[in-house]
A protein has these predicted regions:
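Non-catalytic beta/alpha edge segments that cap or flank active sites
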Residues: 1-158
Length: 158
């Protein structure tokens, strides 16, 4: 199976309120389109467990191949993206998580503060969920590592 559909979920109260522009989400959408994906959904949601769970559930049920969740990977009181993602992922790709960390550390010592995870919702296929910290640099690093391997991930998942 060749993955073709993607969704971008940005969890950020400051973007939702208009205090900050959605530059990381826009970059993610652009990178996904450049990689040949159809971005069917690009939403900004409030931070917090329930909102992230609801948005992920909708994309997984829709059969979206690649779901990028930006934000909520720190240790703040509303940062639950990794915990929610963990409930959906059955095959975690810790090697890719490490590659993303190493790539991020080339640019910023803060890369190690992200708790983002990457994994498949089903060992036989399903959706690939990618967590990224909310900076443009983090999104570029994360997708720069993962996107070249998406075809291999889905081929191996068969």
């Amino acid at each position: 199976m060749t993955p073709t559909t993607a969704a971008i979920i940005v969890t950020a109260d400051r973007i939702l309120s208009g205090e900050k522009p959605n530059t990381a989400g826009e970059l993610a959408a652009s990178l996904m389109v450049d990689a040949g994906f159809e971005v069917g959904s690009h939403v900004v949601i409030a931070e917090g467990y329930a909102r992230v769970a609801e948005a992920l559930r909708a994309e997984v049920r829709a059969g979206t191949h690649v779901i990028v969740v930006i934000g909520g990977t720190g240790v703040g009181t509303t940062n639950y993206t990794p915990e929610v993602t963990g409930e959906f992922v059955t095959a975690r790709l810790t090697g890719l998580e490490t590659q993303v960390l190493l790539k991020g550390l080339e640019s910023s010592h803060k890369a190690g503060l992200s708790r983002g995870i990457i994994g498949m919702t089903d060992r036989g296929g399903g959706s690939l969920i990618i967590n990224s910290a909310s900076s443009r640099g983090a999104v570029a690093d994360t997708l720069g590592v993962v996107l070249p391997l998406v075809g291999d991930i889905f081929r191996d998942a068969r």
